[in-house]
């Protein structure tokens, strides 16, 4: 029976560390601040924004939410981003998705200064992931790494199979794991005989967006299984791993909910603080 990779407990420790770092910045006269931009009134986006505000408040990070009408022009959104980019009191900027259909997501996300891009989606930050340079990286792949390292998992030398090639989790995770000296195989929804690959893995990371895709017979005994999926099913949510089955053969497994997702908001806040350091290097 597998032991849990307990994201909730790790998140508590991480938040305490962030509080201490916020305190140190405030002692230097810097009040860390996150600005969130919401266009329209998508109910899920409103909930996400409010949950970030709650976490932000609890950590001592200032929070500013700007809500623009759904019919806002792209130019008005870009003008707001320009003003936030130029404001030295704003250290992190986040654009809530989805944006209205008439707005170019790519243009808007690329307008955010890379050193304030707490979502880690700016093309320059994506490039930094590949090159190994310091930048702001997406919270979910960082969470997959963090949940393992803080649970005592040795990544170096392991064969890690990532199931999923998405822009926000699968692809960046390849390069973040390579930095930890693992051997990486990436699979996806079109991979024939997926189990032939996952059965070779010391560590499986599932991030493909298919409910309970990874079954017991796809996991070698003693493997570590990290579930970064989140899928709505009748009666709740589940991951990309069939948790009840796979926990019988894995040595460690992250649950959904209560695993990887528990760390993501805290890691966004950590990016706000990392952004301060990057901005100071650039002389703002």
From Swiss-Prot:
| Domain of life, per lineage | Bacteria
* One BP term from GO: tetrahydrofolate interconversion
Reaction catalysis annotation:
(6R)-5,10-methylene-5,6,7,8-tetrahydrofolate + NADP(+) = (6R)-5,10-methenyltetrahydrofolate + NADPH; (6R)-5,10-methenyltetrahydrofolate + H2O = (6R)-10-formyltetrahydrofolate + H(+)
Molecular functions per Gene Ontology: methenyltetrahydrofolate cyclohydrolase activity; methylenetetrahydrofolate dehydrogenase (NADP+) activity
So where does NADP(+) get bound? 164-166, 189, 230
UniProt GO cellular component terms: cytosol
Under SUPFAM superfamilies, the record lists: Aminoacid dehydrogenase-like, N-terminal domain (SSF53223), NAD(P)-binding Rossmann-fold domains (SSF51735)
Keywords of this protein's UniProt record, alphabetized?
A: Amino-acid biosynthesis, Histidine biosynthesis, Hydrolase, Methionine biosynthesis, Multifunctional enzyme, NADP, One-carbon metabolism, Oxidoreductase, Purine biosynthesis
Question: Gene3D superfamilies of this UniProt entry?
Answer: Leucine Dehydrogenase, chain A, domain 1, NAD(P)-binding Rossmann-like Domain
EC no. given is 1.5.1.5, 3.5.4.9
Q: In which pathway does it act?
A: One-carbon metabolism; tetrahydrofolate interconversion
Write down the Pfam families for this protein, in alphabetical order.
Answer: THF_DHG_CYH, THF_DHG_CYH_C
InterPro entries per record: Aminoacid_DH-like_N_sf, NAD(P)-bd_dom_sf, THF_DH/CycHdrlase, THF_DH/CycHdrlase_cat_dom, THF_DH/CycHdrlase_NAD-bd_dom
Description of how the protein assembles with itself and partners: Homodimer.
Purpose of the protein:
Catalyzes the oxidation of 5,10-methylenetetrahydrofolate to 5,10-methenyltetrahydrofolate and then the hydrolysis of 5,10-methenyltetrahydrofolate to 10-formyltetrahydrofolate.
Q: Which family does it belong to?
A: Belongs to the tetrahydrofolate dehydrogenase/cyclohydrolase family.
Identification of the protein by name: Bifunctional protein FolD 2
Question: What is the source species?
Answer: Desulfitobacterium hafniense (strain Y51)
The taxonomic lineage of its organism, from the top, reads:
Bacteria, Bacillati, Bacillota, Clostridia, Eubacteriales
């Amino acid at each position: 029976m597998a032991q849990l990779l307990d994201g909730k407990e790790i998140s508590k420790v991480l938040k305490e560390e962030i509080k201490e770092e916020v305190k140190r910045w405030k002692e230097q006269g810097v009040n860390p601040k996150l600005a969130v931009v919401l266009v329209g009134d998508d109910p899920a986006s409103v909930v996400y924004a409010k949950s970030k505000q709650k976490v932000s408040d609890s950590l001592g990070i200032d929070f500013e939410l700007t809500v623009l009408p759904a019919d806002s022009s792209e130019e008005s959104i870009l003008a707001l981003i320009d003003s936030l980019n130029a404001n030295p009191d704003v250290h992190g900027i986040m654009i809530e998705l989805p944006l209205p259909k008439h707005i170019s997501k790519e243009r808007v996300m690329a307008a955010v200064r890379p050193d304030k891009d707490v979502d880690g989606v700016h093309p320059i930050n994506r490039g930094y992931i590949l090159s190994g340079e310091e930048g702001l990286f997406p919270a979910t792949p960082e969470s997959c790494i963090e949940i393992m390292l803080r649970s005592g998992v040795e990544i170096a030398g392991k064969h890690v199979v990532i199931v999923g090639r998405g822009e926000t989790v699968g692809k960046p995770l390849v390069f973040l794991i390579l930095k930890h000296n693992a051997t990486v195989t990436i699979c996806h929804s079109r991979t024939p005989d997926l189990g032939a690959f996952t059965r070779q893995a010391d560590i499986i990371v599932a991030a493909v967006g298919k409910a309970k895709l990874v079954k017991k017979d796809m996991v070698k005994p003693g493997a570590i299984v990290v579930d970064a999926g989140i899928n709505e099913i009748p009666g709740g949510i589940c991951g990309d791993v069939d948790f009840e089955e796979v926990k019988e053969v894995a040595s460690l497994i992250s649950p959904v909910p209560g695993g990887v997702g528990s760390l993501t908001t805290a890691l966004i806040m950590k990016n706000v603080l990392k952004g301060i350091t990057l901005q100071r290097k650039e002389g703002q």
